[in-house]
């Protein structure tokens, strides 16, 4: 192999490495954004669950009345 062939191969490898670094950084940013969204959604679910428990606790007990169709 000639020096030119080696240089071409090294250039190709450097371009691949650069592309992979950019792709990894982009994917890292996407994952970070998604984790922030997941965290916010988990907090919302917990808050809604707490509100539901509070609403159920505040609801009066059902009366022992027959249904309206009787």
Curated annotation (Swiss-Prot):
It holds the Pfam family SlyX. It comes from the Bacteria. PANTHER family: PROTEIN SLYX. Belongs to the SlyX family. HAMAP family: SlyX. This is Protein SlyX homolog. It comes from Nitrobacter winogradskyi (strain ATCC 25391 / DSM 10237 / CIP 104748 / NCIMB 11846 / Nb-255). The lineage of its organism: Bacteria, Pseudomonadati, Pseudomonadota, Alphaproteobacteria, Hyphomicrobiales.
């Amino acid at each position: 192999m000639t020096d030119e062939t080696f240089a071409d191969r090294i250039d190709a490898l450097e371009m691949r490495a650069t592309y992979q670094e950019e792709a990894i950084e982009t994917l890292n940013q996407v994952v970070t954004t998604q984790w922030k969204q997941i965290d916010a959604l988990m907090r919302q679910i917990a808050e809604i669950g707490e509100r539901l428990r509070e609403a159920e606790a505040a609801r009066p007990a059902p009366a022992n009345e027959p249904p309206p169709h009787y």
